[in-house]
């Protein structure tokens, strides 16, 4: 899946009734949205780059929780980092609770995801980087990634 398709998924998600986001501005390669939730001042910025990377940043603060739903979203390879705050995710009948300092990786299609974003001490910040499997292989071939990352544990 190319970055344009992933970016279009973000546009569709932000515009959906269940996202909880209000679109602030949108171009062919940049999108900005604000949380609709009273008491929270969260913003999300998404950029699509011709290099094959899509970057999403969410930051802000306030009080309360921010529930959101994602019905279908496909990733090439995606890296998520919670910088501050917490995220409670329900995916495929399983629950995940990443918090500040945690990184998690996703690949492939996500269906019927519900998440609740929770600021810690009034703040929240998260990053999401989506890139192709080919880019991951290139980084590996260039020696940028440790070989141990690619060995399966037995």
Regions found by a protein language model. Name each.
Residues 19, 24, 38, 51, ...:
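Feature targets compositionally biased, intrinsically disordered low-complexity regions
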Residues 45-152:
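N-terminal regulatory/effector-sensing and dimerization cores
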Residues 2-20, 24, 139-154:
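Amphipathic alpha-helical segments enriched in hydrophobic/aromatic residues interleaved with Lys/Arg
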Residues 31-49:
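N-terminal, Lys/Arg-enriched amphipathic/low-complexity engagement segments
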Residues 24-37, 80-85:
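N-terminal short leaders/motifs
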Residues 23-31, 118-124, 154:
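Repeat-unit-sized solenoid/scaffold elements
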């Amino acid at each position: 899946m190319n970055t344009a398709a992933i970016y279009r998924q973000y546009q569709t998600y932000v515009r959906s009734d269940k996202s909880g986001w209000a679109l602030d501005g949108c171009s062919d390669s940049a999108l900005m949205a604000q949380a609709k939730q009273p008491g929270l001042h969260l913003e999300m910025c998404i950029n699509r780059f011709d290099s094959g990377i899509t970057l999403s940043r969410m930051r802000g603060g306030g009080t309360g929780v921010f529930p959101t739903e994602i019905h279908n979203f496909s990733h090439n390879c995606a890296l998520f980092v919670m910088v501050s705050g917490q995220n409670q995710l329900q995916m495929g009948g399983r629950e995940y609770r990443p918090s500040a300092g945690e990184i998690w990786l996703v690949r492939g299609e996500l269906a019927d995801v519900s998440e609740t974003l929770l600021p810690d001490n009034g703040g929240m910040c998260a990053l999401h980087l989506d890139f192709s499997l080919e880019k991951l292989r290139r980084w590996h071939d260039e020696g940028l990634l440790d070989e141990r990352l690619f060995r399966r544990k037995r």
